[in-house]
């Protein structure tokens, strides 16, 4: 049943006529800062197609027709609409992938502290999977923890070997 207090839902292929002029006004105000002639694209005057996407936003806008090249002095609307995703993508590409210290974790598995040596190996693998998922901060944190635990268990293993050799050769037979 439809609730009379709520406005009726629109078809995904239609937009209200009030939305397009408001959007055009906003874009005009942004682009008029340089006081240059505007070349508004046909995507604002034409109908907009809304398409369901699989992300957190419920819809994405796909314009009909070709996009016209923007003026060289004014920023393009395409880049201004997608500035946050472009900045995020370029920022993620500029950062180098954090180290996961997998080789160090595998090397620590050869020390005599055997069951505990699996812990840095697990953290190293978790760090590698975090990089693949795009969580660079989590991958960096897990990589540092894997490095710390690997070095700790290697030192502990060396101490155990020194104690075992010392006890073995100092005890009279």
Curated annotation (Swiss-Prot):
Induction / repression: Target gene of PPARG, expression is induced upon PPARG activation. Expression is inhibited by TNF.
Cysteine pairs bridged by disulfides in the record: none
Composition-biased stretches (Pro residues): 1-10
Tissue-specificity statement: Expressed specifically in white and brown adipose tissues.
Alphabetical keyword list: Cell membrane, Cytoplasm, Membrane, Phosphoprotein, Transmembrane, Transmembrane helix
Subcellular location(s) of the protein: Cell membrane; Endomembrane system; Cytoplasm, Perinuclear region
Known function: Regulates insulin-mediated adipose tissue glucose uptake and transport by modulation of SLC2A4 recycling. Not required for SLC2A4 membrane fusion upon an initial stimulus, but rather is necessary for proper protein recycling during prolonged insulin stimulation.
Protein name: Trafficking regulator of GLUT4 1
Gene from which the chain derives: Trarg1
């Amino acid at each position: 049943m439809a609730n009379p207090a709520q406005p009726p839902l629109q078809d995904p292929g239609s937009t209200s006529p009030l939305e397009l002029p408001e959007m055009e006004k906003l874009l005009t105000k942004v682009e008029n800062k340089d006081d240059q002639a505007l070349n508004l694209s046909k995507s604002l005057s034409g109908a907009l197609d809304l398409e369901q996407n699989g992300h957190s936003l419920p819809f994405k806008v796909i314009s009909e027709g070709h996009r016209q090249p923007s003026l060289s002095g004014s920023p393009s609307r395409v880049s201004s609409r997608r500035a946050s995703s472009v900045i995020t993508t370029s920022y993620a590409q500029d950062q180098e992938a954090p180290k996961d210290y997998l080789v160090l974790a595998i090397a620590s598995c050869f020390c005599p502290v055997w069951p505990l040596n699996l812990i840095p190996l697990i953290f190293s693998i978790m760090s590698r999977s975090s990089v693949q998922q795009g969580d660079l901060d989590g991958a960096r944190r897990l990589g540092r923890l894997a490095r710390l635990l690997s070095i700790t268990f290697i030192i502990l293993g060396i101490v155990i070997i020194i104690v075992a050799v010392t006890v073995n050769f100092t005890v009279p037979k």
